[in-house]
Design a protein with these regions (language model features):
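Hydrophobic transmembrane alpha-helices
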Residues: 213-216, 251, 291-298, 435-438, ...
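Hydrophobic mid-bilayer segments of alpha-helices in multi-pass membrane transport proteins
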Residues: 41-45, 67-81, 98-107, 131-140, ...
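Membrane-water interface regions at transmembrane-helix termini and the short interhelical loops
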Residues: 30, 55-60, 82-93, 119, ...
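Conserved, well-structured core domains of diverse proteins
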Residues: 1-124, 131-135
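Hydrophobic transmembrane alpha-helices that form the pore/transport pathway of multi-pass ion
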Residues: 227-295, 301, 314, 484-517, ...
Length: 624
């Protein structure tokens, strides 16, 4: 028998969530400045946002110079905001002296890079100054990464030391020749495969602009609109609060791109509401964790990781977005049905009518907030670039918010939205910069190719499911404790070649790695989303994670089926008839719903264990 729940205020819950997130997420441990330093920081964040929008709108800088200028803002801001150590006091009036020195080193070294890059690109020769400036560039980048995404910095250092120091001593497949310091610096700093590579490019363009767009949506009142719409749609159905959590977390998760932050933001409201309705605390925490995690691969924004995928695959973002649509829909449909079945099993009802806002009133008061999203999608589907579409959507958000007094963004709100957007782009930006080091290291040593060949020798050509199983395990392990964008890129480097080698299509291989890298957020032993949700709910972390894996079963199963049948990735396979897509979608829908039912506990009350297992196997076969 469970002990009675202690009544906790919303403020206490918010404080608790903040502490949990700070423990697992460096972005929540940012310094808070007071006095003149606060105004200076605000001004720099505003200037950075204006520069990024201007540079992406008019494109007067070349790609490399834009990336370098982006880093010249990014690193100093990281040293300003991220504490040197976890236990450091957050509230400050001035910066520590060592951070001022690091800021100077970052600006001078990357400023030198900005000025000298064209000359180096023409001649291909480095002098001693170029080499040592390159060393400083790497050192300051690693220090920023250590503060902002510690695990990622460690992984990058392992790759770097592998070919710089230890590679020559390793025999066989993973061995490599010796590299001089000059060659290493040229590859990782003075080339577009290192710190100035794809990661920096995506951070300086898509990620910054879409994070800024998400901040403007938030400050326009879009979050409240999502919550109210979810209440009107499913609030009165059995287990309504849990379904509201699923819908709200899905929509917010696709915008902010951080599963942990999403749990902390929406979970402090939805988890207590689910518990109050009658759900057990472990289940309530698991629902929030699963719903928040799926937002990272849910169109139209996909937490910015979709743009990285499009860049790597050299395809339009629209194609990636369409490919992700069916898997994301089935993931959330399965979760909603699981929540519904649990409510039925427990005999739970929905919220009373007086607690549900009227749909007409919600649409009248906040329906106009959908216009920026409609503009974004309309521009992308009519051929405009995602960058142009997002910038226009940002500018549209401001006048649209003026339609109603309740949502009106005044100058102060616009400034706050801009500052928060810039601040939110720092953590993921640092991850993207250091990802360049990982990619450059792997490319230089052929480690990814060698690793892929080793796995292919083990599984054999054409063994799609066996290769997929090995990549699934690898993706979950490499994705543990790493932000969504970084998790996908790390997995992409070593796993996509394996899947391509066993016969998967390019889109299927990339989507497979993305989904499993994201699902590491709910997979023990790390399961950071489950950890934060369990802390808010006062539930057992391991039990919460196991329930979360059961609730997110569609996410664990579907990737194997679109490896074999890429029709589930809409638009990724040419020559597929519409009727074939509809048939595959219909059978997959029936399959995931049937699996959710089989795992809900309801069939167990009527059938033996053997019969239930047989029913589950039959349902899995339906998806295929």
């Amino acid at each position: 028998m469970e002990e009675p729940e202690k009544i906790v205020s919303q403020t206490e819950l918010d404080d608790k969530a903040q502490k949990l997130v700070e423990e697992k997420d460096a972005d929540s441990r940012l310094r808070v400045y007071v006095g003149p330093m606060e105004k200076v920081l605000t001004a720099v964040l505003l200037i950075w946002a204006v520069f990024q929008v201007w540079a992406n709108m008019f494109g007067t800088l070349g790609a490399v110079k834009l990336r370098t200028a982006h880093i010249m803002f990014l690193l100093p801001l990281a040293f300003t905001l991220y504490p040197t150590f976890k236990k450091e006091r957050r509230r400050r009036r001035v910066m520590p002296v060592w951070d001022i020195a690091l800021i100077a080193a970052a600006i001078l070294s990357y400023g030198y890079l900005f000025m000298r890059y064209d000359a180096i690109a023409r001649t291909g020769r480095l002098n001693s100054t170029d080499v040592w400036v390159g060393v400083v560039c790497l050192v300051v980048a690693f220090e920023a990464a250590r503060r902002a995404s510690g695990n990622l910095a460690i992984i990058a250092l392992i790759f770097l030391s592998y070919f710089a120091v230890w590679g020559r001593y390793i025999p066989g497949t993973f061995g490599t020749s010796a590299f001089t310091l000059k060659r290493m610096i040229k590859a990782l700093v003075w080339d577009t495969n290192g710190v100035l590579g794809t990661g920096a490019g995506v951070s300086a363009t898509y990620i910054f602009v879409f994070v800024l767009f998400g901040a403007f949506l938030k400050y326009s009142g879009f979050s409240q609109f999502i919550n109210d719409i979810a209440l009107t749609l499913v609030g009165q159905t059995p287990g309504g609060p849990a379904k509201v959590a699923v819908i709200a977390s899905a929509l917010m998760g696709m915008i902010n791109g951080s599963a942990i932050a999403n749990v902390a933001t929406t979970g402090t409201i939805t988890i207590p509401l689910m518990k109050k309705t009658g759900y057990k605390k472990d289940f309530a925490a698991a629902v929030e964790a699963v719903a928040s995690t799926g937002g990272q691969f849910t169109p139209p924004i996909m937490g910015a990781v979709g743009f990285v995928m499009a860049e790597f695959m050299c395809v339009s973002y629209t194609k990636v977005m369409l490919a992700a649509a069916i898997p994301a829909f089935l993931y959330y449909l399965s979760l909603l049905y699981s929540v519904h079945l649990e409510a039925k099993r427990l005999g739970l009802s929905g919220l009373s009518k007086e607690n549900i806002p009227q749909a007409g009133k919600v649409l009248r008061e906040r329906g106009h907030l959908l216009i920026p999203l409609v503009v974004l999608l309309a521009l992308m589907f009519t051929g405009y670039t995602p960058l142009f579409a997002a910038i226009i959507a940002i500018f549209v958000t401001i006048p649209v918010s003026w339609v109603r007094k309740e949502t009106r963004m005044d100058l102060e709100t616009i400034v706050r939205a801009t500052v928060e957007g810039s601040r939110s782009a720092i953590g993921v930006g640092i991850s993207c910069i250091i990802i360049g080091v990982i990619i450059g290291s792997v490319n230089m040593t052929s480690l990814g190719l060698n690793f892929g060949n080793l796995i292919l020798r083990v599984v054999g050509d054409g063994h799609l499911f066996l290769g997929g199983l090995m990549v699934m395990i690898m993706s979950i392990i490499l994705g543990m404790g790493v932000p969504g964008v970084a998790a996908y890129v790390i997995v992409y480097v070593v796993a996509v070649p394996v899947l391509r080698g066993v016969g998967a299509t390019e889109m299927a291989a990339n989507m497979f790695c993305l989904i499993y890298a994201c699902l590491s957020n709910i997979t023990p032993p790390v399961a950071m989303s489950s950890y934060v949700a369990a802390g808010i709910a006062d539930s057992n972390m391991t039990k919460t994670s196991l329930i979360a894996m059961k609730l997110g079963i569609a996410g664990f199963i579907l990737p194997f089926f679109f490896l074999n049948n890429p029709v589930l990735l809409y638009g990724s396979t040419e020559g597929v008839a519409v009727s074939e897509t509809i048939r595959t979608f219909a059978t997959a829908t029936i399959g995931v719903l049937a699996i959710a039912e089989g795992l809900s506990g309801l069939p167990m009350q009527k059938y033996s264990t053997g019969a239930t297992a047989l029913r589950l196997v039959t349902r899995v076969m339906l998806i295929a």
